[in-house]
Amino acid sequence: GIKTLDGFDWSWPKKINRALLQQVFRLDFLPQHGNVILLGGVGVGKTHLAIALAHTACLQGKTTLFTSAVDNVNALAAAQATGGIKREMARLLKPSLLVVDELGYLPIDKFGADVLFQGISQRYERGSTVITTNRAFKHWPEIFHNDSTLTSALLDRLLHHAESIVIEGPCYRMRDQSDA
């Protein structure tokens, strides 16, 4: 089924700022081109909430694009190889809301770090971005090819108008596993 905020199991996360999350779902950040970072371990509901945010934006008539960080980088790499990088970058810049899922789950090479930086930089104050990640900000240089200068610049733009929501708890998908 469609992921919604109503379908989110609030009893599962050990820690989540429910009031802030509900405020974010009013989408007041979209007209201001703000961003949302959903930060937490594996299986705590980040992707569910990101999909639900995108769905809510669609219901309000906003253009939305959902992609994983790796798919995003791969699409840009393929576009670079065929001379279509400007067109692919434009596709990422066009929607009111861009959701980048799973940033930090897999390492990104220098090209990937550079193009992700370009995309987020170009969206700065022009469009909203939601990012799900399992990495604390202090570990983001590891995502971006250990380029601390690029990472600092990226975080500066991303966090300037952003709400960061930390979700803590065990993996929801493992809730039915016994301790046998």
Which sequence ranges carry the predicted segments?
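Charged, amphipathic alpha-helical linker segments immediately N-terminal to NTP-binding catalytic cores
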Residues: G1-A19
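A generic structural signal for short, non-catalytic loop/turn and secondary-structure boundary residues
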Residues: G1-K3, P31, H160
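Flexible glycine-/small-residue-rich
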Residues: W12, G40, G169
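Conserved P-loop
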Residues: I16-K94, I143
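Walker B motif beta-strand of ABC-family P-loop ATPases
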Residues: L97
